[in-house]
């Protein structure tokens, strides 16, 4: 008798996706982050669901309801901090996952890559709206500043901002709709993840060498299921150390002050995972220019397949490209640091130089270095 997992319509899909999936035998730990992102999404949906049971999306009671969750709800403090810090873990995994894709040339599977970038955008939007919900000072002012950027769009900008706000300022209507969107988007993300996997399984996984690995495939289970479980345990370990020992390490102390439209915090800044883009935004002294640079800093990922001029897919055997890749990583870390600093000398200059370097490496240096490597290898 044939195994049920190979005949049952539903089990067959699961079997082809997670059990009998032919997988390259040499994929490294850098390929673990896909499953870790799935774990983060699951944690976020579950903890978010329980938080939504006690949260009230109203300007008068939002802050108090979060306090109530932390003080009165059974293990509410734990659920809240797991939710807040899992968001950080989510973005750490996202950045490493995208970085892996850039390093090993995974963007050559452009359908999978493009869906991945759409996912990145939607996750960023979800995280931004979630940050507004506790209705602390940084929630309110972050929402005001970031949504106000849309007013830079010519002609329709101001109308668009007021339409998003549901009034003439960030208020009850804004909070209510942000809560609604924050609730629905993770399910849209889940659907996009399924499409992401669908396209990935059309081609099969890339591998560190960037070479075709059809001649050397192994089943996903048990080899990579065990490997993914190890990764998941390590992620949960790091997350729980963060949650139980320093839950506010990555948050902003200003968010423990209830939102006050009459008092502006000295330094308005988003969560740490948006700081690199925020630094690029601030480095341009023109509003529309800044917004375009901000959007371009993420959208530029879409043109990586077009900028790939090397004859080799992966950077594994390309030392010059490797060097430039790590310079790009260092540049992004510099931008993240600058994004959290006040707007004054020397931070303004460092931010501008780092922003220029970011776009120069991607648009000019990496393609040029690829051509040099082709020449050196006489290809």
From Swiss-Prot:
Positions with a binding annotation for heme b b562: 83, 182
GO molecular function: metal ion binding; ubiquinol-cytochrome-c reductase activity
Cofactors required: heme b
Cofactor binding summary note: Binds 2 heme b groups non-covalently.
PROSITE patterns referenced in this protein's UniProt entry, alphabetically: CYTB_CTER, CYTB_NTER
Function: Component of the ubiquinol-cytochrome c reductase complex (complex III or cytochrome b-c1 complex) that is part of the mitochondrial respiratory chain. The b-c1 complex mediates electron transfer from ubiquinol to cytochrome c. Contributes to the generation of a proton gradient across the mitochondrial membrane that is then used for ATP synthesis.
Record-given protein name: Cytochrome b
Source organism per UniProt: Spermophilus variegatus
């Amino acid at each position: 008798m044939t195994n049920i997992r190979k005949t049952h319509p539903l089990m067959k899909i699961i079997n082809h996706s997670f059990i009998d999936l032919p997988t390259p035998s040499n994929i490294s730990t850098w390929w673990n982050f896909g499953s870790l992102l799935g774990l983060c999404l699951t944690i976020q949906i579950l903890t978010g669901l329980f938080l939504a049971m006690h949260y009230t999306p109203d300007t008068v009671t939002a802050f108090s309801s979060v306090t109530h969750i932390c003080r009165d709800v059974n293990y509410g403090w734990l659920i809240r901090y797991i939710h807040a810090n899992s968001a950080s873990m989510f973005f750490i995994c996202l950045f490493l996952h995208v970085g892996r894709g850039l390093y090993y040339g995974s963007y050559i599977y452009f359908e999978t890559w493009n869906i991945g970038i759409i996912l990145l955008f939607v996750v960023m939007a979800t995280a931004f709206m979630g940050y507004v919900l506790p209705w602390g000072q940084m929630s309110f002012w972050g929402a005001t500043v970031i949504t106000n950027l849309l007013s830079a769009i010519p002609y329709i900008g101001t109308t668009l901002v007021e339409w998003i706000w549901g009034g003439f300022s960030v208020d009850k209507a804004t909070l209510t709709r942000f809560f609604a969107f924050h609730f629905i988007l993770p399910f849209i993300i889940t659907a996009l993840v399924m499409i992401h996997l669908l396209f990935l399984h059309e081609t099969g996984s890339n591998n560190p060498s960037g070479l075709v690995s059809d001649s050397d495939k192994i089943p996903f289970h048990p080899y990579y299921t065990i490997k993914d479980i190890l990764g998941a345990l390590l992620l949960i370990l790091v997350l729980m150390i963060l949650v139980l020992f320093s839950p506010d390490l990555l948050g902003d102390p200003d968010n423990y002050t209830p939102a006050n439209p009459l008092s502006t915090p000295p330094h308005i800044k988003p969560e740490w995972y948006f700081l690199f883009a925020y630094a690029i935004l601030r480095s341009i002294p023109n509003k529309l220019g800044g917004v375009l640079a901000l959007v371009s800093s993420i959208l530029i990922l879409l043109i990586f397949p077009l900028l790939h001029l090397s004859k080799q897919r992966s950077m594994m055997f390309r030392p010059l490209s490797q060097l430039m890749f790590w310079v790009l990583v260092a540049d992004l870390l510099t931008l993240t640091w600058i994004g959290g600093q006040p707007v004054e000398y020397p931070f303004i200059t460092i931010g501008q130089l780092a922003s220029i370097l970011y776009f120069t490496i991607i648009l000019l240096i990496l393609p040029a270095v690829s051509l040099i490597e082709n020449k050196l290898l006489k290809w």
